[in-house]
Amino acid sequence: MPPRRYNPDTRRDELLERINLDIPGAVAQALREDLGGTVDANNDITAKLLPENSRSHATVITRENGVFCGKRWVEEVFIQLAGDDVTIIWHVDDGDVINANQSLFELEGPSRVLLTGERTALNFVQTLSGVASKVRHYVELLEGTNTQLLDTRKTLPGLRSALKYAVLCGGGANHRLGLSDAFLIKENHIIASGSVRQAVEKASWLHPDAPVEVEVENLEELDEALKAGADIIMLDNFETEQMREAVKRTNGKALLEVSGNVTDKTLREFAETGVDFISVGALTKHVQALDLSMRFR
């Protein structure tokens, strides 16, 4: 039976709780970058070209296909700039498939505020939708296998929870949210601890409920990790045949994760070896933003 202490799905609830705390701060930081260190829309000198009492209606559309993500970040941008004076009419929800030229949402409110918040709101949606779209592509490549796609901690600074939420919207699952929710024992940890067994035993003693993962670079290290009782074993830069042998040797005694050299060309091949997880750092560190635009009507 697979180890009982590891289930990526449980991280979903943890992440959603963290999102509630992180969104206001992330949005405030983004607005301060645009508004001279404040969240005061009056600092937008170009927007002052418009009459102070002018109100406008705007529509945000996508210029390419993808998966939408970022609804709550958009809402928070305009809440911080104008309280409840901006109305948002949503045509999509997080996780929805979107098509080129589709209207995503409409905005009605003070013209100055709509223009001031435009770039910050679109930055969040473009980035998060880009991640969700790439994840969905990878997830579709895994259809018919028993392998689950995971993200990593390789995220853009300040956007950890947001990017991991986008992974969920794309259909993937979360690896560690940070350094406090699971052990990932690598070469330097093993050297400092004395051995794989000593590192795993101490980890299990320190935090009995936390999953213990060990990264290995060859089949001999895999055997050591299995004997030590690791919950998950990460196969780092293994060749495909080595992965098959690792699955055979493990025989359900631990969960296996593949990392390294993963692209949309190799993903399916790796999954068909029978590993449990494939983690891809590029999902959240090489972000290609979705092309969106806002137009006044």
From Swiss-Prot:
The keyword Transferase applies. Keywords: Glycosyltransferase, Pyridine nucleotide biosynthesis, Transferase. Substrate binds at R119, T152, R153, K154, R176, K186, E215, D236, S259, G260, N261, V280, G281, A282. GO terms for cellular component: cytoplasm; cytosol. CDD domains: QPRTase. It comes from the Bacteria. Pathway: Cofactor biosynthesis; NAD(+) biosynthesis; nicotinate D-ribonucleotide from quinolinate: step 1/1. It catalyses: nicotinate beta-D-ribonucleotide + CO2 + diphosphate = quinolinate + 5-phospho-alpha-D-ribose 1-diphosphate + 2 H(+). GO terms for biological process: 'de novo' NAD biosynthetic process from L-aspartate; NAD biosynthetic process; quinolinate catabolic process. It is an enzyme of class 2 (transferase). InterPro entries: Aldolase_TIM (IPR013785), NadC (IPR004393), NadC/ModD (IPR027277), Nicotinate_pribotase-like_C (IPR036068), Quinolinate_PRibosylTase_N_sf (IPR037128), Quinolinate_PRibosylTrfase_C (IPR002638), Quinolinate_PRibosylTrfase_N (IPR022412). PANTHER family: NICOTINATE-NUCLEOTIDE PYROPHOSPHORYLASE [CARBOXYLATING]. Involved in the catabolism of quinolinic acid (QA). NCBIfam families: nadC (TIGR00078). This is Nicotinate-nucleotide pyrophosphorylase [carboxylating]. It comes from Escherichia coli (strain K12). The gene is nadC.
